[in-house]
Amino acid sequence: MLSKRVIPCLDVRDGKLTKGIKFQGNVDIGDPVETARLYYEAGADELVFYDITASSEGRGIMLDVVDRVAREIFIPFSVGGGISTVEDMRAVLLAGAEKISVNSAAVKNPDIISLGAAAFGSQCVVVGMDVKHVGVSEQIPSGYEIVIHGGRKAMGLDALEWARTVEALGAGEICCNSIDADGAKTGYELTLTRMIAEAVTIPVIASGGAGNPDHMADAVTTGKASAALIASIVHYGEYSIKDCKDHMAKRGVKVRNIW
């Protein structure tokens, strides 16, 4: 059995670590490079960096931050935000990232997934899905809709259908983020996470809503995710990476420990 991964997520805006609730009310809370180093030393399995305004502002990638992070940590990390071409992907990987994450760009141009997978391998391509619960309809039979630009634009695209599509196009992993749960610390959207995880054969990362280690254990058991993405609970010092992994282990979840 593969170990379940604990992945801190660092949202970056203007070169600074930031955090909000449901993609709104973001406040700066620290230096992303220093925070990345601390999480690496604390036993994080991977890290995720999102430039949360690059896509909506139509600007490039935070390559300076990627380069500085790569010099400080020695675990896999992925980078998303502002990546819309194979050239963007190449630049991020050359700067030191192991994976690239595409979200809005993939919805607008799904070919970016297959082009990236062909150029760099599926293991490098993560598709981020921002998802909102809208109720079952003819257009959205699963009841979950894909949204982009931080949840501000609904796409009329069913989340379950999109997950199957991105796998077929060559994505190596899906990061499924619930806009409804994001930053609220009330738990992951387990129905959504399980639905996506059962529909595809590639790993699914649960994202949005972690408030305590129990929620993380729920995500990888009930939700069938391969990993739990976390932010607020570690950014604000409520729990350490060790706290999270120790509790998950007590729940019978296999995790990687460095202590």
Curated annotation (Swiss-Prot):
EC number: 4.3.2.10
Catalytic function, reaction form: 5-[(5-phospho-1-deoxy-D-ribulos-1-ylimino)methylamino]-1-(5-phospho-beta-D-ribosyl)imidazole-4-carboxamide + L-glutamine = D-erythro-1-(imidazol-4-yl)glycerol 3-phosphate + 5-amino-1-(5-phospho-beta-D-ribosyl)imidazole-4-carboxamide + L-glutamate + H(+)
Chief place where the protein resides: cytoplasm
Pfam families for this protein: His_biosynth
Superkingdom field: Bacteria
GO-annotated cellular components: cytoplasm
Gene3D superfamilies attached to this UniProt entry: Aldolase class I
Any single GO BP term: L-histidine biosynthetic process
Known pathway: Amino-acid biosynthesis; L-histidine biosynthesis; L-histidine from 5-phospho-alpha-D-ribose 1-diphosphate: step 5/9
PANTHER family: IMIDAZOLE GLYCEROL PHOSPHATE SYNTHASE HISHF (PTHR21235:SF2), IMIDAZOLE GLYCEROL PHOSPHATE SYNTHASE SUBUNIT HISF/H IGP SYNTHASE SUBUNIT HISF/H (PTHR21235)
Cross-referenced NCBIfam families: hisF (TIGR00735)
Self-association state and partner proteins as the record states: Heterodimer of HisH and HisF.
Similarity remark: Belongs to the HisA/HisF family.
Record protein name field: Imidazole glycerol phosphate synthase subunit HisF
Name of the gene this protein is made from: hisF
